[in-house]
């Protein structure tokens, strides 16, 4: 009988949901440097394998630990006996470098380089590109051992994963499932939605005059007028219907003010309609003595304005005498000479 392999998580009694998601600096300093120095790890999270002997889709079964990403310590062989280029042939294809190398630092000190590679099936340079990606971490030249062997590096650290290119991309690329990253919090989705709401443009004031918003404002006004001390909580729970707040339930002061505003608007509209009817019923004759008729019409309009000003000013003459005197006593220090404008307050006797 074979010996049953133990799960690394069970060996350390780690709780469910544990994920191995180290940073680039941690992979180089805490794992690769220690591996090159001959350090033994108490928990074998990263397996040891020559990954250039296998196709990438076989590597997950060779890994010690991992769900979506798999980590390996692997040696690198030289492409030529005395050269410094690595041999990238692996399995039924080859690994091809892509992008630019990234220098990894720790406490302001350069410790290693991160390189991205893509696996191609077939022979270079006419291979077929796949979705398998490798991130290769290696130490700097000064930190590597050169003993004249065929191996370019004793150990490099590699992260293998398959890029998922099928299916539509998610709406928010910043969201990740808990199976991919261990440090993702449960509040990441809510923060993304808050950012989306904050990015929406603010509504202009013209939208506040929409009928639906006006009805909502009226309902809010009616709810605010309810006395909280006498409010029946059964209404809030939906056990009783909400009482209608019509004109009979409104306060006398509010009802009187509302009726006054309506009467004023109706009276003003009637005056405007009467004026328009008179104009259309008696249009001016422009073919005869146009100049004389225009002068007469202007005199009638000016006479009507003067009468209206006299009627309104007589009602508030006592209140406006002090204001008028204080206004006329002011000296125009800047020489602007603003024209005197008649104050039309819109009150009727």
Swiss-Prot record:
Q: Where is the composition biased (Low complexity)?
A: 177-191
Every copy of the NAC domain together lies at 14-163
* PROSITE patterns (alphabetical): NAC
Annotated compartments:
Nucleus
Question: Where do the TM regions start and end?
Answer: none
Q: Tell me which InterPro entries the record gives.
A: NAC-dom, NAC_dom_sf
Q: In which tissues is it expressed?
A: Expressed in guard cells of the epidermis.
Listed GO CC annotations:
nucleus
| Physiological role | Transcription factor involved in abscisic acid-mediated stomatal closure. Regulates the expression of NCED1, a gene involved in the biosynthesis of abscisic acid (ABA). Required for the stomatal closure induced by the bacterial pathogen Pseudomonas syringae pv tomato DC3000, but not for stomatal reopening.
> Which PANTHER family does the entry link to?
NAC DOMAIN-CONTAINING PROTEIN 72-LIKE, PROTEIN CUP-SHAPED COTYLEDON 2-RELATED
- The name on file for this protein is NAC domain-containing protein JA2
Quick one: which gene encodes this? JA2
């Amino acid at each position: 009988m074979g010996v049953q392999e133990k799960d690394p998580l069970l060996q350390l009694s780690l709780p469910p949901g544990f994920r191995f998601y180290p940073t680039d600096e941690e992979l180089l300093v805490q794992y690769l440097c220690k591996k090159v120095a001959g350090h033994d790890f108490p928990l074998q999270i990263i397996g040891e394998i020559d990954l250039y002997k296998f196709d990438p889709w076989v590597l997950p079964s060779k890994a010690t630990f991992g769900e979506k990403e798999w980590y390996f310590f692997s040696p690198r062989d030289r492409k030529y006996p005395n050269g410094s280029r690595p041999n990238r042939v692996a399995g039924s294809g080859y690994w091809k470098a892509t992008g630019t190398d990234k220098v990894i630092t720790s406490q302001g000190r350069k410790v290693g380089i991160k390189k991205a590679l893509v696996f191609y099936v077939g022979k270079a340079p006419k291979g077929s590109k796949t979705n398998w990606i490798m991130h290769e971490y290696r130490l700097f030249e000064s930190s590597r051992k050169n003993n004249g062997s065929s191996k370019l590096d004793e150990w490099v650290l590699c992260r293998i994963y398959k890029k998922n290119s099928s299916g539509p991309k998610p709406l928010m690329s910043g969201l990740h499932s808990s199976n991919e990253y261990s440090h993702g919090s449960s509040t990441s989705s809510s923060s993304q939605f808050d950012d989306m709401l904050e990015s929406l443009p603010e509504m202009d004031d013209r939208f506040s005059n929409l009928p639906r918003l006006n009805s909502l404002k009226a309902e809010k006004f009616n709810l605010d007028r309810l006395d909280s001390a006498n409010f029946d909580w059964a209404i809030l729970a939906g056990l009783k219907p909400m009482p209608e707040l019509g004109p009979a339930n409104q306060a006398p002061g509010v009802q009187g003010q509302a009726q006054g505003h309506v009467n004023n608007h109706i009276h003003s509209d009637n005056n405007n309609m009467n004026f328009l009817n008179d104009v259309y019923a008696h249009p001016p004759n422009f073919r005869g003595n146009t100049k004389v008729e225009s002068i007469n019409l202007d005199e009638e309009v000016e006479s009507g304005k003067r009468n209206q000003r006299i009627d309104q000013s007589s009602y508030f003459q006592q209140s406006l005498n002090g204001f008028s005197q204080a206004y006329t006593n002011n000296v125009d220090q800047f020489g602007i000479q603003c024209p005197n404008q008649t104050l039309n307050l819109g009150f009727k006797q």
